[in-house]
């Protein structure tokens, strides 16, 4: 039976749904070591022309937590706090470094006591000049991150960093600048980047922005030849056993455009492609035009896990990523979350807890008379794991998940709605899917709950079941002792044919009843047709479901 959905019903369902926001929360947990987080990081952060015309305070508000800043001496400074200015190759300058610290970063950190910010300094100043500036900013000392304040075995968690108020990390590209700067008896610590992290070469993407995909180079050579990207630990001189951080550079170092950034540089597929070529999960993702494209969703997926949708079957790395959806309970409208409509054909799961249920629908209102897939996660899926569901049109029973597909005319490339929730306990979600063809083929007619006792007429019911259409069923889930009876008579009398189906043991994986015109028994069910054939003639149902 071809289902028609009135436009008003579709619009109402979408508007009423609890749509997850496009900009997800930065992190769901603050109890992982710092090296297990990823952060949006802006290249030449002070140049708003390359950052969607947004100054650094706006970037902070939008969730940016890494900032690349170039600092130069100001030979015309008349006061110590003006000794250093922020410039791009001395061609364009953007004011005093102290002003940005005092008026932008310090107020943000004071107002947000759980947040951590990292500043990457491209340094053209001396220690004395930096000391002059720091000495005018005593508040920095109370915010500065100092590794000496934490045990040697691992990076502190975000919560531990917040508890000690060590929430502003300074990294410099010059070893002679690194060290402690004493201000009123307290240190401001600047770390030498090559001791603590690795980077890919920032120049591979090319000098100029371009709308030609082949002009982009997604390879991932290391920036420093003596530090392979897979270098595991920080430098021994740090006296720490901490994991090295990774800054993944993904920007054109000459010009950038919002169009190129959105289509290529900050596109989910190409961010993932760079990561795959690097072979390391980034802690910092350095980009231009951070608000164009999907870098925020990409980073959210790395931090919090998510549902990754792919354009092709198999969810393989060669396929384009449609989008990543954060795992938040509710209804996800794909378009509102950056997903192209009717594109996805497979998915992978990361960082998802046991007991999560994900349901994908063809119908935007979630009508179960059309194609839908129910996925129950059976074990915790790690944040760095990609658990693949290769197609939306298969029943699958795996150690990590169970997928039940109720077919109408196909779901691949047609997903319009996703619901995220919890797997019901026991047999609370027991159900039967009825089909218009034998062997659970042709159109899906309706899905009926099998967890209670109820009767219904086929042409007048709340499930959408049709009169004189049903020929087979798929028992999705059922408790032993449940049964149902179908009759050819519209009032449920037995004189126009009847078939009883008894559940002999718990059914937790889909079981097909290929026809209601036969009599048979196996370990799972007893099917009894009483004399007259009823396939395609069913008009009434008695449901006796147990839970």
Enumerate the language-model features and the residues they cover:
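Classical secretory targeting signals
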Residues: 2, 13-16
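Bacterial N-terminal signal peptides that target proteins for export
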Residues: 1-9
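Compact beta-sheet-dominated domain cores in extracellular/mature segments
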Residues: 304-547
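Catalytic cores of phosphodiester-bond hydrolases, prominently lipid phosphodiesterases
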Residues: 25-305
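Cleavable N-terminal signal peptides
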Residues: 11-12, 22
């Amino acid at each position: 039976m071809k289902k028609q959905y009135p436009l008003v019903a579709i619009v109402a369902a979408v508007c009423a749904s609890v749509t997850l926001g496009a900009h997800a929360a930065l992190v769901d947990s603050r109890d992982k070591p710092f090296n297990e987080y990823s952060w949006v990081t802006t290249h030449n952060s002070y140049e708003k022309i390359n950052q969607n015309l947004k100054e650094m305070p706006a970037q902070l508000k939008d969730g940016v937590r890494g900032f690349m800043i170039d600092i130069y001496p100001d030979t015309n400074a008349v006061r110590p706090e003006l000794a250093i200015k922020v410039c791009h190759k001395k061609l364009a300058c953007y004011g005093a470094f102290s002003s940005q610290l005092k008026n932008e970063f310090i107020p943000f950190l004071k107002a947000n006591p759980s947040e951590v910010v990292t500043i990457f300094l491209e340094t053209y100043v001396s220690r004395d000049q930096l000391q002059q500036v720091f000495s005018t900013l005593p508040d920095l000392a109370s915010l500065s991150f100092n590794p000496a304040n934490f045990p040697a075995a691992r990076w502190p968690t975000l919560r531990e960093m917040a508890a000690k108020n060590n929430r502003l990390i300074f990294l410099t590209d010059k070893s002679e600048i690194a060290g402690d700067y004493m201000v009123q008896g307290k240190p401001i610590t600047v770390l030498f980047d090559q001791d603590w992290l690795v980077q890919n070469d920032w120049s591979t993407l090319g000098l100029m922005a371009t709308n030609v995909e082949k002009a982009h180079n997604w390879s991932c050579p290391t920036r420093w030849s003596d530090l392979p990207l897979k270098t595991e630990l920080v430098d021994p001189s740090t006296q720490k056993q901490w994991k090295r951080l990774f800054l993944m550079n993904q920007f054109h170092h000459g010009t950038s455009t919002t169009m190129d950034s959105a289509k290529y540089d900050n596109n989910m597929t190409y961010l993932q492609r760079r990561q795959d070529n690097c072979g390391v999960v980034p802690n910092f993702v350095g980009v231009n035009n951070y608000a164009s494209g999907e870098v925020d969703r990409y980073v959210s997926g790395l931090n919090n896990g998510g549902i990754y949708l792919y354009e092709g079957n198999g969810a393989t790395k060669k396929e384009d990523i449609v989008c990543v959806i954060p795992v938040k309970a509710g209804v996800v409208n794909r378009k509102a979350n950056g997903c192209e409509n009717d594109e996805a054909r497979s998915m992978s799961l990361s960082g998802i807890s046991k007991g999560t249920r994900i349901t994908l629908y063809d119908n935007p209102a979630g009508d179960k008379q059309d194609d839908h897939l129910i996925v129950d996660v059976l074990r915790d899926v790690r944040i760095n794991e990609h658990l693949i569901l290769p197609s939306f049109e298969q029943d699958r029973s795996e150690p990590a998940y169970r997928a039940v597909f109720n077919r109408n005319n196909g779901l691949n490339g047609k997903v319009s709605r996703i619901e995220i929730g919890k797997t019901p306990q026991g047999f609370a979600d027991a159900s039967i899917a009825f089909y218009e063809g034998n062997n659970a083929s042709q159109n899906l007619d309706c899905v009926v709950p099998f967890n209670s006792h109820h009767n219904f007429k086929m042409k007048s019911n709340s499930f959408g079941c049709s009169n004189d259409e049903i020929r087979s069923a798929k028992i999705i889930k059922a408790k032993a002792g449940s049964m149902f009876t179908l009759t050819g008579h519209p009032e449920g009398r037995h004189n126009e044919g009847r078939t009883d189906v008894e559940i002999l043991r718990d059914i937790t994986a889909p079981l097909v009843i290929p026809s209601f015109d036969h009599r048979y028994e196996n370990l799972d069910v007893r099917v009894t047709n009483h004399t007259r054939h009823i396939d395609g003639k069913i008009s009434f149902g008695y449901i006796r479901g147990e839970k």
